[in-house]
Regions:
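Peripheral docking tails and interdomain loops at the edges
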Residues: 312-363
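Glycine-rich beta-alpha junction loops
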Residues: 114-116, 176-183, 262-264, 315, ...
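Conformationally flexible catalytic loops at phosphate/diphosphate-handling active centers
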Residues: 40, 169-248
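Glycine-/acidic-rich phosphate or pyrophosphate-binding loops and their flanking alpha/beta elements
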Residues: 15-18, 234-256, 269
Length: 363
């Protein structure tokens, strides 16, 4: 989980939001369109200060609805573009995100998740898992979703997200949370211009003598055509399954498996250490891609462990995908905090002990 820093790299102490924005500039984005909302406003602020120095475009739109439609237009013109928001702002973008997915345009959307539902709180949460991983907007579509667990990954995953978005012509999302956005850590920044950009063959360029004009649309009146587009999308999503990423921590001898992503996985890593000090053989599986989801490794580990416990900062969302992947091979339990509350390692260890005692009494 922790990156070894090279003394020759550009190493800085930065907030997660700032590291993400700086990485995006170094990834060569042409434009950023956004609207301020806590706890991700520093992303827009950083772009406003730095993008003009590097000949990029930054626009504070009048709303999140406007932001995502600016992304739609700029992506359709072949630009490398990004927006960011937090939970209720992402909800306002959902119609536009669905259009972008249907039109098969690459872009990066960042959700610095905060507590809800409703306007909620500005504290960190993982309550947007379903919204992010299951599509969120209308129709059968998926985003590629990456879940960072450190400020370093807030920067690194920008490059990964753009690579995947452009490889598959699909919107990608970095699903972070308010704590990761606000915390400060050392980060090794990538070199500027290290993510190559090439002219997009599918982009609209107006009239041209060199090729047929492209039409970017998500409107298909004939049901046969709409079904064919859906079939193409589903075939693409099958290919995206090859991009699954995860991290295993002390799973080789584990009898109890924690499953957690993002900030919760950092808490669980400490809980694993504390549990092992008590003689409990606990391991951790950390999904890095939430879509595609690491179903295969969960299915394999389910045959080796007594039970699984998912730790989330919500009422229980990823646990459903874990249970589906385990497919009855072992019990799957859930422990969560809601509304912006963060579970502690001690709470996790206590829950492990309670479940272990219950499990042993049933054997």
């Amino acid at each position: 989980m922790e990156k070894v820093l090279n003394k020759n790299e550009d190493i800085r102490l930065m907030k997660g939001n700032e590291a993400l924005a700086e990485a995006a500039i170094r990834a060569g984005i042409h434009a950023y369109f956004g609207y301020p909302i806590t706890p991700q406003s520093e992303v827009l602020e950083y772009f406003t200060l730095e993008m003009p120095k590097r000949k990029g475009i930054v626009v504070q739109a009048e709303s999140e609805v406007a932001s995502i439609n600016m992304i739609y237009g700029a992506a359709g013109a072949g630009a490398r573009v990004m927006t960011s928001s937090s939970s209720p702002g992402i909800s306002l973008m959902q119609e536009g995100i669905s259009y972008i997915a249907s039109a098969q345009l690459p872009c990066l959307i960042v959700n610095v998740n905060r507590g809800g539902p409703g306007l909620g709180t500005i504290q960190p949460s993982q309550g947007d898992y379903w919204q992010s991983v299951k599509g969120g907007g209308h129709g059968d579509y998926h985003l590629i979703v990456l879940a960072p667990a450190s400020v370093q990954e807030m920067a690194d995953f920008v490059f990964d997200a753009f690579r995947l978005a452009e490889k598959y012509r699909n919107p990608a999302m970095i699903l972070a949370d308010g704590a990761l956005g606000q915390m400060m850590e050392k980060v090794a920044l990538p070199s500027e211009g290290s993510l190559p950009y090439s002219e997009s063959s599918w982009a609209t360029t107006g009239k041209t003598k060199d090729r047929e004009r492209n039409i970017i649309t998500s409107l298909f009146i004939e049901p046969e055509k709409m079904e064919q587009i859906n079939i193409q999308l589903q075939e693409k999503y099958k290919k995206i399954q090859d991009e699954v990423r995860y991290e295993e921590i002390q799973t080789s001898d584990a009898e109890i498996l924690l499953v957690a992503y993002g900030l919760s996985s950092r808490i669980c890593q400490k809980a694993v250490d504390q549990a092992r000090e008590k003689g409990l053989r606990v391991g951790l599986l950390r999904p890095i891609t939430l879509y595609p989801f690491p179903k295969k490794i969960i299915s394999e580990l389910a045959l080796k462990v007594e039970f699984m416990l998912t730790i989330e900062m919500n009422a229980g969302q990823m646990v459903e995908d874990v249970a589906l992947a385990a497919n009855g091979r072992c019990p799957v339990h859930f422990k969560g905090r809601m509304g912006g509350m963060i579970p502690s390692p001690e709470e996790v260890v206590e829950e492990i002990e309670i479940l272990l005692e219950k499990h042993l009494s049933e054997v």
